[in-house]
Amino acid sequence: MGLYFFPKEERLKKQEDFLRILREGKPYSLSKNFVVYIRKGAEKRRIGISVNKKVGKAVVRNKIKRLIREVYRLHRPYLKEDIEMLVIVKPGENIKNLDFHKVKEMLIKIWEKAGILKK
């Protein structure tokens, strides 16, 4: 496979994994609507995405998840290997208007703040 892929092993799906990251991870955010919990020292790099039902209908929530997954997929080679992250999106004014560039900008700033980008 190429460099930019998103294998199933890197997806967080189980509730226990989400709860562990919420408990052990450190929260980072740029706004109250977009929070990323990052747990360092994991066995492998993994990501989970949670979009609150109050954000909008399923179409809107799924679009936001796809945008986050795509930013992660493209920047995956530049992230450290031993992290688990949980992206939580809550309802707010500008959340429905998110586009690829806004999501990319927010996630990169959070990743820099957390120090998980490779040098």
Swiss-Prot record:
InterPro entries recorded: Ribosomal_Su5_D2-typ_SF, Ribsml_uS5_D2-typ_fold_subgr, RNase_P, RNase_P_CS
Keyword tags: Endonuclease, Hydrolase, Nuclease, RNA-binding, tRNA processing
GO process annotations (BP): tRNA 3'-end processing; tRNA 5'-leader removal
GO molecular function, one term: 3'-tRNA processing endoribonuclease activity
Any single GO CC term annotated in Swiss-Prot or TrEMBL for this entry: ribonuclease P complex
Source species, domain of life: Bacteria
EC number: 3.1.26.5
Cross-referenced Gene3D superfamilies: 3.30.230.10
Subunit structure: Consists of a catalytic RNA component (M1 or rnpB) and a protein subunit.
Protein name in UniProt: Ribonuclease P protein component
Gene source species: Dictyoglomus turgidum (strain DSM 6724 / Z-1310)
Annotated gene: rnpA
